[in-house]
A protein has these predicted regions:
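A contiguous strand-loop segment
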Residues: 20-118, 138-142
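Generic detector of solvent-exposed, compositionally biased contiguous segments
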Residues: 18-20, 127-128
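Positively charged n-region of N-terminal signal peptides that target proteins for export
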Residues: 1-4
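N-terminal signal peptide c-region/cleavage motif recognized by signal peptidases
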Residues: 14-15
Length: 144
């Protein structure tokens, strides 16, 4: 077992550190059946504060301004949900958790007209979903 841990650590250390880090343990892998998820935006100087979005009720017709997660550049507006849930980091009050390990992409694939970047998509989905399936549906509807 020690040999496997050491080998895994060496392989991880040798890999380029340009993507974010997720640590996920399923209920069958933990000693007490707990599910453990952690996320860190730790690539190339992306260290950030712990995000907090308190639960809220919004007026019908209220708009939400979208700013790029990486650059804070204004991208546009979308309709705000009438109710949003409490989010701390990458988990909401319903225990929905979203992580990511993006690594750039091809420049010719960038949609310059898009108004929702991946970071905003994560936080919007967490603020609006009670289940993982609901989060997927919300994210899909926002990018279609």
């Amino acid at each position: 077992m020690k040999r496997q841990i050491i080998l895994s650590a060496m392989l991880l250390a040798a890999a380029g550190a340009l993507a974010c880090t997720n640590f996920i343990v399923g209920k069958k892998a933990s000693k007490d059946g707990s599910v453990i998820c952690s996320y860190s935006a730790d690539s190339y100087g992306m260290f950030q504060d712990l995000a907090h979005f308190p639960a809220a009720h919004h007026q019908k017709g209220e708009m939400r301004q979208i700013y790029d997660w990486d650059t804070n550049k204004y991208l546009g507006e979308i309709a705000e949900a009438e109710e949003t849930y409490n989010v701390i980091g990458n988990i909401n009050e319903w225990q929905v958790t979203i992580g990511e390990t993006t690594f750039g992409g091809r420049e010719e694939m960038v949609d310059t007209t898009g108004i929702i970047d991946y970071g905003s998509l994560i936080y919007i989905a967490l603020q609006r979903s009670k289940t993982a399936r609901e989060a997927i549906n919300i994210m899909t509807s926002l990018v279609e």
